[in-house]
Amino acid sequence: MSPLADHRFLKMNGLGNEIVVLDLRASSHVVRPEEARAIAADPRSRFDQLMVLHDPVTPGTDARLRIYNRDGSESGACGNGTRCVAWAMRADPVMGRAGEQLTLESAAGLLAVTRVSDTDFTVDMGPPHLRWDEIPLSEPFPDTRRIELQIGPIDAPILHSPGVVSMGNPHAVFFVDRDPETYDLGRIGPLLEAHPLFPERANISLAQVVAADRIRLRVWERGAGLTRACGSAACAALVAAARLRLTGRRATVTLPGGDLVIAWGEDDHVRMTGPTELEWEGRFPPALFAGAA
């Protein structure tokens, strides 16, 4: 039987981005990809990202995160999920004991989180990575503000010349001149996610700059598909826009699930502020993992 059988979890969301928070700090178990897929397949625990807490390794940190996508793959960063973890570690009656600030370890590095209100948190996502080999890309591009990539006819592409950024996970941001909702991202997204230019696959965003301090964004999330919100994609969109001088270094990013405020500081760190919501708590039924043994 899986050690996750009958284990407690929290179903949350950050702007509609479906998050499950699982506390394994009292366990040595590491979630297997097939277990993550089984959790995602159950309507009660469906997620875009599964945020798993482990005991910290680095002194002075509060927990170590492993982040799973719906397809069982792992991700280096999830801003919306990190805010949900911060809420749980502060306010949940079982998990909650953190203060106004906490520091989490992730594959992307240390994430500092600050409480803004009972439901809103600011996450320091760290500096963006902009070199082609840091993103990574499969071939050199000296200027990643716009790279040679398009989809559609050569003389009339549907999308072209994205900016590429890593926020601990790879992002390609295509700037468009009309509402991103008018594009068939459900069809285009998986083609671009798996493009040979992205050896680790990529998150694909369509960004419409509507003002110097506002971006409208839609995201195809690597390993998860269409999502109502993606915090790291919002960070990448602001960085990509600011590098092209399409916006300033602070903007409100509007996603289908709501707004995030993104600021790219003079210290090169990108900070994201947004809400969290607890939907319910539950326990995994043992039968859920029957096929994941």
UniProtKB/Swiss-Prot annotation:
Reactions mediated catalytically: (2S,6S)-2,6-diaminopimelate = meso-2,6-diaminopimelate
An annotated GO BP: lysine biosynthetic process via diaminopimelate
Annotated positions for site Could be important to modulate the pK values of the two catalytic cysteine residues: H171, E221
An annotated Gene Ontology molecular function: diaminopimelate epimerase activity
Top class in the EC scheme: isomerase
EC number assigned by the record: 5.1.1.7
SUPFAM superfamilies in alphabetical order: Diaminopimelate epimerase-like
Keyword Amino-acid biosynthesis tagged: yes
Subcellular localization(s) per the UniProt record: Cytoplasm
Family assignment from sequence similarity: Belongs to the diaminopimelate epimerase family.
Name used for this protein in its record: Diaminopimelate epimerase
Species per Swiss-Prot/TrEMBL record: Methylobacterium sp. (strain 4-46)
